[in-house]
Amino acid sequence: SRGLGDVYKRQEKGQRLFAYEYNGYWKDVGTLGSYWEANMELIDIIPEFNLYEEFWKIYTKGDIIPPQYIAADAVVDRSIISEGTEVYGEVHNSVIGAGVTIKKGAVIRDSIIMKQSVIGENDVIDKAIIAENVTVGDNVVMGTGEEVPNKLKPNVYSFGLVTVGENTVIPPNVKIGKNTAIVGETTSEDYPGGVL
């Protein structure tokens, strides 16, 4: 990683340092908490890093996918919804990637859901970062309960976030607490008493 610590190490070793004055938006997103905050800032009415400025150009070729579909009885507020996403539930104060499906009865709050993920019926997801190609079963509650430090990596999995790694499968009818990280295909047996 390249951060401020690297600058100090180079200075101590007497290595040459160079500086560049930059007046644009910059935010250190080296932790899950700061990454989550940076995404939530994009939802502000006029974000500091304003993606809607006239001088922003599109330099990458986008996927050829249909526009977003928001069902008639769906609710979306203060959120960014990418192309190809289908919303049948509720999305509040969240950033949703391309090709995501949010099924009927699901409620998403203060979360980041990356592309091609599927959120099941009647799921409640609070303050989560969900990576690409994740499948969440029906009736899952995520980000629930008291904020308890993560047992394995309390300095990494903190900030009250639930973190779900790419290609993860979460079975239906489970509850996932705050500061939890899930990776890989899981089954009901991985959730003692239906809770993690």
Q: Residues of each region from the PLM?
A:
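Left-handed beta-helix
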Residues: 2-196
